[in-house]
UniProtKB/Swiss-Prot annotation:
Domain of life: Bacteria
Disulfide bridges in this chain: none
Signal peptide segment: none
Residues holding Fe cation: 99, 101, 156
Record key words, sorted: Dioxygenase, Iron, Metal-binding, Oxidoreductase, Vitamin C
Cofactor detail note: Binds 1 Fe(2+) ion per subunit.
Name used for this protein in its record: PKHD-type hydroxylase P9301_13621
Biological-process GO terms, alphabetical: DNA damage response; intracellular iron ion homeostasis
EC nos: 1.14.11.-
Cofactor: Fe(2+); L-ascorbate
Chain ranges of the Fe2OG dioxygenase domain: 81-175
Length: 222
């Protein structure tokens, strides 16, 4: 499965975000159906912070900055645009049924989807993220501050929360390379070249690999 899990936020950043979210009024938290497509809205049952609140805008900027500061995430996703960031919470009996993300949103194309956990996974029961491919189905329950990125073309769901509260940040990435398969080729090539660089230092042979990577990205990127 083509996904990446990475520690994005530290404990201090998580606590600051959660403190600001706690200050938001009940009116700031909207029915999650408001931003879902017509089909997905039929299976969506959660709350999301209004994107127009200052808390949402400020912390969306923080998340964007953190993503763009991660060499690993940039190599994996080749982000052209990070968009649609919002903070959502699911209390007891809330869930998000099996669905596919809209390919085009008002904020951009969805090539990769991401979820960042803001809650200790031991503080709620259920609420696992389910990601499906043609042959597999995997469940994920992230540690606080971890991000998972996966192709938006995958069917996915969030299991019902049985107890506690699941608080996450979600969003989408429009990539310079919209093909999942081609992104994987480039990611492997970049990872291999960087590993050789760290172990053996610069060489004429590595220059050729980095040259080929750059020209391949230039050729297939948008």
């Amino acid at each position: 499965m083509n996904y990446l899990i990475h520690q994005l936020l530290n404990a201090e950043e998580i606590n600051l975000i959660k403190k600001e979210l706690d200050k938001c009024s009940q009116q700031d938290w909207e029915d999650g159906k408001k931003t879902a497509g017509s089909h997905a809205s039929m299976v969506k049952n959660n709350l999301q912070l209004n994107r127009n609140t200052e808390v949402s805008k400020k912390n969306a900027q923080l998340v964007t900055k953190k993503i763009l500061s991660s060499q690993l995430i940039k190599s994996f996703s080749l982000p052209k645009k990070i968009h649609g960031i919002m903070f959502t919470k699911s209390s007891k009996n809330m869930h998000y049924g099996r669905h596919i993300d809209n390919p085009y949103m008002s904020s951009g194309r969805s090539d990769l989807s991401f979820t960042i956990s803001l809650t200790n996974k031991d503080f709620y029961d259920g609420g696992e993220l389910i990601i499906e491919t043609m042959n597999t189905e995997e469940k994920f329950k992230l540690n606080p501050g971890e991000i998972i990125l996966y192709p938006s073309s995958y069917l996915h769901a969030v299991n019902e929360v049985n107890n506690g509260e699941r608080l996450v940040c979600v969003g989408w990435i429009e990539s310079y390379v919209k093909s999942t398969e081609k992104r994987e080729y480039l990611f492997d090539l970049d990872a291999g070249a960087r590993s050789l660089l760290s172990k053996h230092g610069r060489s004429d042979e590595l220059d050729l690999i980095f040259k080929s990577y750059s020209n391949l990205l230039r050729d297939i990127g948008e």
